[in-house]
């Protein structure tokens, strides 16, 4: 703090730049991370990047029944939802601490930020 209770702008700028670098690193880690979700006890598995992009889908031939396509569709959706949920957990773990710098406490010395 400078005299008069004003924040030191160079210190705030350095802190903001550090947070930006941490955010970029966390986003890169998320983009490279892959998680796998499953349904039907592993009969259908889906692989999703941390960004939410589906990059893989494996279906055990045992669940392919031409007379019961709906079950297979449900299993595929379930596996993708499971993987997406795991990707969101990774995002919360990686970005949560960084977002905490803006929410609630905000930037030190700057109310509302």
UniProtKB/Swiss-Prot annotation:
Pfam family, one: YbaB_DNA_bd
Chief place of localization: cytoplasm
Keyword terms: Cytoplasm, DNA-binding
GO CC annotations on file: bacterial nucleoid; cytosol
Keyword DNA-binding listed: yes
Cell compartment(s), UniProt: Cytoplasm, Nucleoid
Origin superkingdom: Bacteria
GO molecular function, one term: DNA binding
Family: Belongs to the YbaB/EbfC family.
Subunit-level organization: Homodimer.
NCBIfam families per the UniProt record, alphabetical: DNA_YbaB_EbfC
Function as written in the Swiss-Prot or TrEMBL entry: Binds to DNA and alters its conformation. May be involved in regulation of gene expression, nucleoid organization and DNA protection.
UniProt name for this protein: Nucleoid-associated protein ROP_41370
């Amino acid at each position: 703090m400078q005299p008069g209770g004003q924040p030191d702008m160079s210190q705030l700028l350095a802190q903001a730049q550090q947070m930006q670098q941490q955010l970029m690193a966390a986003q890169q880690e998320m983009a490279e991370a892959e998680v796998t979700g499953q349904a039907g006890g592993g009969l259908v598995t889906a692989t999703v990047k941390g960004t939410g992009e589906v990059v893989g889908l494996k279906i055990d031939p045992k669940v392919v029944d031409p007379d019961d396509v709906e079950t297979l569709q449900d299993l595929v959706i379930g596996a993708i939802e499971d993987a997406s949920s795991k990707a969101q957990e990774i995002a919360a773990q990686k970005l949560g601490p960084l977002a905490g710098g803006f929410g609630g406490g905000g930037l030190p010395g700057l109310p509302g930020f």
